[in-house]
Amino acid sequence: MVKMSIQLNEFQKKALQSFLMSDKNLLITAPTGTGKSFLAMLMAMETKSRVVYTVPLRALALQLNDDFHNKVAPLVNGYADSVALTSEVYEEDPENLEERVIFTTYEKADAIFRRHYPWTDRIETLIIDEIHNIGDKERGKAIENLIAYAMNEGIRIVAMSATIPDVNKIAEIIDAEIIKTDERPIPLYKAVKIGNKLYFEDGDVIELKEDFIKKMVRKNKVVMIFTSTRKKAEELYMIYDRKFQNKVAFFHAGLDAETKLRLLEETRQGKYNIIVSTTALSQGVNFPFYAVVFDDLKLPIIEYGRFTGWKQITPIEFDQICGRAGRPGYDEEGLCIIEATDIRQAEKLKRTYFNTSYGTITGHHVLEDFLLALISKYIYAKPDRIMEATKHTISFRNISEELVKEKLEELKNAKLIGEDGTGYFVTLYGRAVAESYFDVKDAITYHDVLTKNNVKEEEIINAILENENVLNASKGENVNIIFNSWIKGVDEKTIVKATKNMTLNDLNKLVQTLSWQTYGVYRITKALGKKELADKLRLLFLEIRYGVPASALALVQLPGIGRKRAIELMRNGIHNKTELCSQKEISKKIIGEKMVKVLCK
């Protein structure tokens, strides 16, 4: 056992002992602030073979990897042999990964398992942080896949969350010992605020002598103000920034990972007292908040990138956000406040969000997607192994063998899998779909377009632009206009300025989604044996990935050039390294004499 220079709390001691003294799977349920992530990293440190630590966000994977190196390893006199894998789901990863501990997202881990890298055979432990996301319509699918893979292969599972509904059901699915505590090392007090009075969940009432936010700034505390949308977050930021200059920041999904990590570090250093945020901060990112104030309890419903209405925050979502308050090492207590207009509303809010149960958990997986992922993972699978895997899911644990056979037959008819009489195997086409992380529904749509007689490239592009994932990433903007502007090399800021709601990070996410879909379609086309068409799609993928026309691709891939300079060189008649070096005077004006010397030596 590693030697530690810190004292563990009783909950951590019990959980670590269970991990070390047995090989059981563990389901750990404990409030935010009890040190679950630190505990899981200690477990990773104690595991001799490979560990995959999965989380909901890339930013969180990067943060945990950083903490593993800079905080956990020094405390236990250990070596942080780890890496964060945060590339896109469709992108390849190293065939021979050296690091022992991998921090990544659920989806990336799922994609990795499908690709049969040699190093995945040595995975001993799978850590699933924020396991409550198994009930999420989008995130839950990957978690269910990961659990099925792990249970089928004897990989140990450690699952954790502060807000687990149906604890016993999840424990049964992963065959886990439950380790539970309700005690927070830092007490969290919940209250409803009406005017200048705080009505606490235990019945106490406190009258505030000054504005609450003003008091927090004066006492140098950090407050998170939760609101429903980015636009509202930025509006509240402007209001508070006028009152408390340079002490306010906003945080939402439109910010890139680097900016999010910078805000976290600057807040820890005391630069900000007020962070206005959307639900982007509900998933484990460890800001030092003393208080969380709910400006709103609604969330927007977005379908195909467009706003369609509102929904109330669920008790799980509320507690995930509320639990950000009161962090060990920063405060001795935490405070969570909901704004209300009158006593009647306050009592209703208390009943809904204070001391409430989380209800039941429902799976949202699609059976044919699960089956294709499973068969692709194993390359070949017999019916009994497939049925055994369904027992370890929320979505299919009680499914009939007849329905599974029916869906397997549909996958066969779609030529995604084949059968040899005793089991099922994945076809080249099916493997291309699974490794591209495509839904079966989308794959069939693309297949129908690709196999048309004399299909034109424009038809394939239209199918990509009409894909649900692309539309969801578009924020309701005109995808055709953005797509054409991007591959022609139009400046990013110019593209964003022409939209209603996009940020630069939104544009980046849309480009990533377009790249993912295009590369996947290229993979499928190649698997179908359509080489000429595949070559065209490979070129289209590169145009989207780099944001330049084909005539500038040779330039943009040169070290140090980048998109903006490649476009400028192209507009000056330079299209490749040979032309760049033969027209040095023009090149020097655009990329500088030093870079010309480096590239042309």
Curated annotation (Swiss-Prot):
It is an enzyme of class 3 (hydrolase). Residues 208-375 form the Helicase C-terminal domain. One of its GO terms (molecular function) is helicase activity. ATP binds at residues 30-37. The keyword ATP-binding applies. A motif (DEAH box) lies at residues 129-132. The keyword Hydrolase applies. Its EC number is 3.6.4.-. Disulfide bonds: none annotated. Keywords: ATP-binding, Helicase, Hydrolase, Nucleotide-binding. InterPro entries: AAA+_ATPase, DEAD/DEAH_box_helicase_dom, Hel308-like_dom4, Hel308_SKI2-like, Helicase_ATP-bd, Helicase_C-like, P-loop_NTPase. Residues 17-182 form the Helicase ATP-binding domain. It comes from the Viruses. This is Putative helicase 7. It comes from Sulfolobus islandicus filamentous virus (isolate Iceland/Hveragerdi) (SIFV). The gene is SIFV0007.
